[in-house]
Regions:
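Amphipathic alpha-helical elements of HEAT/ARM-like alpha-solenoid repeat scaffolds that form extended
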Residues: 31-50, 77-90, 114-127, 150-164, ...
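Eukaryotic acidic, Ser/Thr-rich intrinsically disordered low-complexity regions
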Residues: 2-15, 19, 160, 166-201
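Helix-loop junctions that connect tandem helical modules in alpha-solenoid scaffolds
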Residues: 15-31, 64-76, 105-119, 139-149, ...
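Short amphipathic alpha-helix initiation/capping segments at coil-to-helix junctions
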Residues: 144-151, 166, 170
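N-terminal alpha-helical scaffold/docking segments in eukaryotic complex subunits
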Residues: 1-54, 195
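Amphipathic alpha-helical scaffolding segments comprising HEAT/armadillo-like alpha-solenoid repeats
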Residues: 9-19, 49-68, 92-106, 130-140, ...
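Alpha-helical adaptor scaffolds
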Residues: 74, 82-83, 87-146
Length: 201
C-alpha cells in the first residue's frame, strides 16, 4: 500500500467525512446543508492530488449534489457552492460530465449573482462545444455579476481564442478590452490589453 503524506491523509479524511454527511442531506436542515456545502466546496479547490481523484469523480455523489440543488433552487449560497464543486470535479479531476450537470449549469448561466460563477466552468464543458452561439454567451459575460469574476474569465477566453474571434464581435471586444485597459492600475496590465487589441484588429 502506498504511503500517503499525513497532511494529504487529513484532507482525505475531511473529504470522506463531508461526503458522508452530505449523503445524509435529507435528514438535515437547510442551514446544516449550507455549512456542509461551503466546507466541501473549499476541499475541491485545495491544491490537487491524485489521492483525491476517487472521491471527486464519484458520479453517485455528483447526483446527490444535483438533488440538493433541486431541493434548494433559491438558496444562492448552496447553488454557488454546488456549481463550484461540480465545476472543479469536472475540470480538475475529470468527473464524468453528464447531461444533467450540463443542464444544471445552463439553468443558472444567466441568473443574476450566480452566472459569473457558472462562467468559470461552463465554457469548458464538453457539451458547450454544441452551444448554438458560443460567442453570444461570451459577450453576455460582460454584464454578469459578480462583475470582477466574469470579466476576468472573459479576458482569459478572449486570450485563448484571440485568432478565432468572429468578425461581427471584434468591435465589441475591442471596446471591452479598451475599458479594461483604462481601468488597469499598472503598466503591465495596460501593456497586455494594448497587445490584445493589436492582435484582434
Amino acid at each position: 500500500m502506498q504511503n500517503i503524506n499525513p497532511k494529504i491523509q487529513d484532507k482525505i479524511n475531511k473529504i470522506i467525512y463531508l461526503q458522508d454527511e452530505i449523503k445524509k442531506w435529507e435528514e438535515k436542515d437547510e442551514f446544516e446543508i449550507e455549512s456542509l456545502m461551503k466546507n466541501f466546496e473549499k476541499m475541491t479547490r485545495i491544491e490537487g492530488s491524485v489521492f483525491y481523484t476517487k472521491y471527486f469523480t464519484d458520479e453517485e455523489f455528483a447526483n446527490i449534489l444535483l438533488a440538493i440543488a433541486r431541493k434548494y433552487p433559491d438558496n444562492k449560497s448552496i447553488i454557488i457552492d454546488i456549481i463550484t464543486s461540480l465545476g472543479m470535479m469536472i475540470t480538475r479531476y475529470k468527473l464524468n460530465e453528464t447531461e444533467e450537470i450540463y443542464t444544471f449549469m445552463l439553468e443558472y448561466s444567466s441568473q443574476k449573482g450566480i452566472s459569473a460563477y457558472v462562467s468559470i466552468y461552463f465554457p469548458f464543458l464538453k457539451r458547450f462545444e454544441k452551444h448554438p452561439n458560443q460567442w453570444e454567451y461570451y459577450m453576455s459575460m460582460r454584464k454578469m455579476t459578480p462583475k470582477k469574476i466574469a470579466q476576468q474569465k472573459l479576458v482569459g477566453i478572449i486570450e485563448q481564442n484571440i485568432n478565432n474571434i468572429p468578425e461581427k464581435y471584434k468591435g465589441e471586444i475591442i471596446h471591452f478590452i479598451k475599458e479594461r485597459h483604462d481601468a488597469a492600475n499598472n503598466d503591465f496590465g495596460k501593456k497586455m490589453y494594448l497587445e490584445m487589441i493589436e492582435k484582434i484588429k
